[in-house]
Amino acid sequence: MSDSGASRLRRQLESGGFEARLYVKQLSQQSDGDRDLQEHRQRVQALAEETAQNLKRNVYQNYRQFIETAREISYLESEMYQLSHLLTEQKSSLESIPLALLPAAAAGASAGEDTAGAGPRERGAVQAGFLPGPAGVPREGSGTGEEGKQRTLTTLLEKVEGCRDLLETPGQYLVYNGDLVEYDADHMAQLQRVHGFLMNDCLLVATWLPQRRGMYRYNALYPLDRLAVVNVKDNPPMKDMFKLLMFPESRIFQAENAKIKREWLEVLEETKRALSDKRRREQEEAAAPRAPPPVTSKGSNPFEDEDDEELATPEAEEEKVDLSMEWIQELPEDLDVCIAQRDFEGAVDLLDKLNHYLEDKPSPPPVKELRAKVDERVRQLTEVLVFELSPDRSLRGGPKATRRAVSQLIRLGQCTKACELFLRNRAAAVHTAIRQLRIEGATLLYIHKLCHVFFTSLLETAREFETDFAGTDSGCYSAFVVWARSAMGMFVDAFSKQVFDSKESLSTAAECVKVAKEHCQQLGEIGLDLTFIIHALLVKDIQGALHSYKEIIIEATKHRNSEEMWRRMNLMTPEALGKLKEEMKSCGVSNFEQYTGDDCWVNLSYTVVAFTKQTMGFLEEALKLYFPELHMVLLESLVEIILVAVQHVDYSLRCEQDPEKKAFIRQNASFLYETVLPVVERRFEEGVGKPAKQLQDLRNASRLLRVNPESTTSVV
């Protein structure tokens, strides 16, 4: 296409008044015929391809600029939000000044101590006045100071909607509070403004109400003994952040500046430590042996039963279980930390240590209470491990990525669940890998990729399964075999959809099935034979392919028979004759030389030669697909194909009156009976491994079908 013609066509299509219907009408009137329309169609198509390439090039060139612009917009939005936050913070500080006067008036001399919690700017006073000391009591003041703390907490929480029940908790007081900004944990996008109230035993998170000044709405309440605090490394513009881990969720908050962030981290850790010390002392007091009751003589109490003495002995033994060791007291909290930090091995090691320590020991109430706390952590740990093996997690790590979670579930006694989750995870991975394969190019190329992806994944899964579940219940291996059968069904669905549903040729289908069988045999390296499964799943599709190709051969043979003139073949050139000899030799006809004459003539009919090549080609491709379940299908298809040819020869021989043509027909019949049929029979026996009686009967019969000599039509 010339440049001038292309530019003229482009200008015409780009014009504002262009109408496709009018343009096509004028083009049809001006064209001389089909050739002009085809040429114009090619020009339009070339212009469309050129436009598409230019569009792709422009998109690629502007892509980087688009990304940079989006990033700058995000940064600008963040800075504007920070500015709005600072202005609102200043406004809130001014509005909260009256609240600072309430605890000051109530506390009297300790006014400076009790002004804590009045707003974001007095966090230092809150920390100094209300943070518990090492002994679990306030650092300064008692009596009036305690009442001031409670009144300050009550005053602040009255500004939070939906937390009336919290005000009734005895002994609870405010430690620290301040404004924060919450971010999405996955995409690091700003979610909302919140206000945190840290009490001596919990953390209250409330969302800011923009319509009502200085008011908040209750959002969440987290006990400190189930809360883990993690510092988030600064990554500008995302800075001054820390993360709170509460199974099964996590939340990220941003402080106003680095100083306030440090205060939050310090006060959270110190408050958690004080709460842990307090509860440990309570457990030690509960587990401490009680003073024995005064012993009275038997004589002074003649009604005392001897059973009381027997019952006292087990009780004394039960009280001998020592739970005062530091690692036992801190075990629930250590388990929470391990779960939050994803230290699954450490958590299971702690559980094993506890179980070993309490083995063969009685279970008094303190032990049962400890067991209840530990069981709750075990449940949480199990849920985390189950989530690690869920298909929602990333599947790119392969089977080895699941080993950590599977091994810990097995150590927790969850072998069956670990097996189920592992196989479900791998099924999702195999399904995703198959779905992500691009269907492009030749079918055989796609099948090579499909087999490589599927059988490699299956082999890796089997090896990892054998590693993870070695020494476990044999029922797990049965589950793996069932899973492998299901995965093979998934593979066959994708295989059949591309090979058989798309109506590929029999030769292509045979090559694809051969590739699949070769890959399937590789599983024998690990003692897994799934060949019978792939045969069972493919037998229906292969039967359909054989039947379809058989019908094609029969229709083609009948069409050639209808045009049969019973004349010798003239190949015109020695090269064509040599090529035909090679083709017949590859079909197994070794004595074809005796049917060739001088000057490139062949003493056989074109119909018989074409039938021979087509039948032998069908047999060779069918043998590539063969397995025992297809024996009768293949044999019956061959018999039907051969019957069409021999019936036509038999009918022509009975009806032909010309002696010369009749002799030529006999020569073709002799070629069919004495050369072609023995070759078919021998090749079938080589491929299958046993002879076929039906083919022997066809060869030995002098007439395959008796036809009325007076009839002029052949009914097949």
Curated annotation (Swiss-Prot):
Binding partners and assembly: The exocyst complex is composed of EXOC1, EXOC2, EXOC3, EXOC4, EXOC5, EXOC6, EXOC7 and EXOC8. Interacts (via PH domain) with GTP-bound RALA and RALB. Interacts with SH3BP1; required for the localization of both SH3BP1 and the exocyst to the leading edge of migrating cells.
Keyword Membrane appears in the UniProt entry: no
User: Where is this chain compositionally biased, Acidic residues type?
Assistant: 303-319
Q: Which PANTHER family match?
A: EXOCYST COMPLEX COMPONENT 8 (PTHR21426:SF12)
The subcellular localization recorded is:
Cytoplasm; Cytoplasm, Perinuclear region; Cell projection, Growth cone; Cell projection
Ranges in a coiled coil? none
Any idea what this protein is called?
Answer: Exocyst complex component 8
* Organism of provenance: Mus musculus
Its family?
Answer: Belongs to the EXO84 family.
Disordered: where is this region? Answer: 129-150, 275-319
- Residue ranges annotated for the PH domain, each copy included: 173-273
Pfam families given in the database record = Exo84_C, VPS51_Exo84_N
Q: Would you say which domain of life the source belongs to? A: Eukaryota
Q: Which GO terms of the molecular function aspect are on file?
A: phosphatidylinositol binding; small GTPase binding
Per the record, where are the segments of Basic and acidic residues compositional bias? 275-284
Listed GO CC annotations: exocyst; growth cone; late endosome; perinuclear region of cytoplasm; plasma membrane
What does it do?
Component of the exocyst complex involved in the docking of exocytic vesicles with fusion sites on the plasma membrane.
**What are the UniProt keywords, alphabetically?**
Cell projection, Cytoplasm, Exocytosis, Phosphoprotein, Protein transport, Transport
Residues modified as Phosphothreonine are T313
Q: Which GO terms describe its biological process?
A: endosome organization; exocytosis; extracellular matrix disassembly; membrane fission; mitotic cytokinesis; protein transport; vesicle docking involved in exocytosis; vesicle tethering involved in exocytosis
Q: Which residues carry this modification: Phosphoserine?
A: S15
